């Protein structure tokens, strides 16, 4: 791993703050927690993890063990494993680790928890959010390269009509109002998203679904 000295580059990244493509870690003490960040970036648009920084400047990587823990997160606690690109920058007498994560072509990338249960995450603004059944359905269809064919039965029209009337609904509300189970409604909402009829957005710790503008 090559060591670089580029103070301006790191200072610029720190000045950007955390966002959809960047996360700061003051220190690393748990590889499983880092796996969540790796999963979120890989399942969204890719991104960068800066280790040894905080919002107001450089803290420095405490030991080489933190570097090994990032590598362990990618190989031991991500399923499937993901490849990372890492660089160390020597800034202000301290080391900063930059970890580049590419968007995966094998979504979802799962992070294993303490019980080795797999969970997929997505990156929204500056947060790692647990993926919902809609994400999983979309990724499943993308992997299988299925064509989206919408058949407008009474059931499909009912969903669109309800969304038009209500404005925005949660997955649970969609299930209740249509009297479909979560598995059925999740598949239909995923198809509608892939077809460009509706969109999902995240607000106050909840995913909502609404018609796209013009629909």
Identify the meaning behind each predicted range.
Residues 1-215:
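Conserved N-terminal catalytic/coupling substructures associated with nucleotide/phosphate chemistry
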